[in-house]
Amino acid sequence: MNDCVTKKMCFETEAALALEAAFDGGRITSDGGLPWLSKMDSEMGLCEAISEHVPEWRKRRGRHSLASLVRQRVLQIACGHEDQNDSDTLRKDPLLKLACGLLPESGEDLASQPTICRLENAATRRSCHRIAEALFELYLAERGKAGAPEKILLDFDSTDDPVHGGQEGSRYHGYYRQHMYHPLLVFDGDTGHLITALLRAGNTHASNSSVALLKRIAGRLRERWPEVAIEVRADAGFAVPAV
């Protein structure tokens, strides 16, 4: 026999109200971890830092702030809802609304798919560069909490991001045998922190832009911690003379 849970559960939230969860139907969410993701984002300042560099494309102030739109998009992706179309369903989700600054029972919903689409298309090359810089600054702040590191291991890697339409920049890659994007990612090999990411066309070689990115990252690390030892780790896709 199954045991039914009848007790209510209380969650810590950023809002000045108690959040109780029950299992008797009613308003249902499939993403119970959103309160913790929201709290982590508030402590790190990730979405706030990104929103500061997203161009405001609206001639008049909309119902949703840039910070709220960015947080909605980031949290949706973090919960596995990467498609923009998911916004039309999740804009009424009680926990996602709470994470983005709306009361679950309020009559106001989050942004729809067209608004999220315009948010992403508002980005320019310059704003993407500034967002990457903001991510790097967040990494430096997190990495330095325990003091100046003696060594930093930079993990360079590329990954395949399949596409299923005519997205701008999508190309066919012979090795992966699919149309895709081919982003370059750099992680801290010791902590797992993402340092930066670079979106590239699908037919780009794995090592493309890695040297320029390495020089920029190493330069900033040495500015912050002059004595730090820097090691680089990458797979065979980066075994080219320039690297």
Q: Language-model features: where?
A:
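Dynamic "connector" segments at or just before major functional cores
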Residues: 1-205, 209-226
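Alpha-helix N-cap/loop-to-helix initiation residues
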Residues: 206, 239-240
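A short acidic (Asp/Glu
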Residues: 165, 240-243
